[in-house]
Design a protein with these regions (language model features):
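Conserved, well-ordered alpha-helix/loop/beta-strand core segments that scaffold catalytic motifs
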Residues: 1-18
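Beta-lactam-recognizing serine transpeptidase/beta-lactamase-like catalytic domain environment
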Residues: 26-73, 78-307
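Short, charged, low-complexity patches
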Residues: 196, 311-316, 320
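Short, gly/Ser/Thr-rich active-site loops of penicillin-recognizing serine hydrolases
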Residues: 225-227, 318-329
Length: 329
């Protein structure tokens, strides 16, 4: 762990529920991992009964690796990848967003019903246009989205020792309403912050996911090194060209889209915000995934703030704190 990043992540999340993960995409080294509500390990034996029975806070749950959340619009990186694999290009895409789209009596709206007008693929991604991506999802279909999602380790084992497997339920017989919801990161899809960090790391590392690790080396009482961890490739999740194209989409989010608060801060960032609705009242978790120093990425972050609203409201400011701490502190 990077002590400065860990402290920054802990303090920036504050007393809110959620999780923060930071990785080095080129090695897989976990630089920070925070889950809240947390507990004091020094008093865990005295407080064990309270912690175990506190279902409201679930302090013993490591939300970073075990938490299961709707991905919201961060899932649009998956939908975008599936579109590219199907069409072989983002060029030629055009969509006229009127703020809502209805198919089979099911309506999807953009945030606050915003009308985006005519968009190409890059603009639709930067705007996080739900209508465009609902249309894209129905064109791709459930079977295609399932294949690409499983390529990105949904419904698959992850290179971790303790985690919950992310779930994706679409298939070739799924109906249009569920496909529309799933393509924008709602529906039945559930994912952990660590899993989203791994997908982002592959994008930042030319498509290759490195095996994540916490411990650099183990030494004995005499200071001699007993074992070391060497960075290791886990799996290629996408081609280098696919990773570069997704990176360009994510750069547009910071330059012209929903994460412009990260623009012009002395470093470059590519990212994707998300607002994951979790109840009938439209309450949402705040998401951000991204990486910095886009020409030679060295820091990946994935952040969720439970009940935090839009990605730009709660998660993006935490990302800014992490990037600032990494480059300037």
């Amino acid at each position: 762990l990077n002590a400065d990043l860990q402290t920054t992540a802990y303090n920036s999340l504050g007393d809110r529920r959620g999780a923060v993960v930071a990785l080095d995409p080129s090695t897989g080294k976990i630089l920070a991992m925070v889950s809240k509500p947390d507990f004091d390990p020094n008093t865990i034996s005295q407080n064990w009964d309270t912690l175990v029975n506190d279902e409201n806070n679930s302090s013993l749950l490591n939300r970073a690796t075990m938490g299961q959340y709707p991905p919201g619009s961060t899932f649009k990186v998956v939908t975008a990848l599936d579109y590219f694999r199907t069409k072989r290009s983002f060029n030629g895409f055009s969509f006229d967003c009127q703020g809502s789209i209805t198919k089979e009596d099911h309506t999807i709206q953009c945030y606050n019903g915003k009308v985006h007008g005519t968009e190409d693929f890059y603009t639709a991604f930067a705007n996080s246009c739900n209508c465009a991506f609902a249309e894209i999802g129905t064109e791709l279909g459930g079977a295609s989205l399932l294949k690409t999602s499983e390529d990105l380790l949904f419904n698959q084992k992850l290179p971790l020792t303790s985690y919950r497997k992310s779930s994706f339920t679409l298939n070739g017989s799924s109906g249009i309403p569920l496909i529309m919801q799933t393509a924008i990161g709602q529906g039945n899809t559930l994912v952990s912050p660590m899993h989203m960090a791994l997908i982002t790391s592959a994008i930042a590392n030319d498509g290759v996911l490195m095996k994540p690790y916490l411990i650099d080396k183990v030494t004995n009482a005499g200071g001699d090194t007993v074992s070391t961890t060497e960075p290791a490739n886990y799996k290629r999740l996408m081609t280098s060209n696919e990773a570069a194209l997704l990176g360009k989409l994510m750069e547009g989010v910071v330059q012209n889209g929903t994460a412009t608060a990260l623009n012009g801060r002395g470093y470059t960032v590519a990212g994707k915000t998300g607002s994951a609705e979790y109840d009938e009242n439209g309450s949402s978790h705040s998401w951000f995934i991204g990486y910095s120093n886009v020409d030679d990425p060295d820091l990946v972050v994935a952040i969720i703030v439970e009940g935090g609203g839009t990605g730009s409201e709660a998660a993006v400011p935490i990302a800014a704190d992490l990037f600032d701490a990494y480059y300037f502190d």
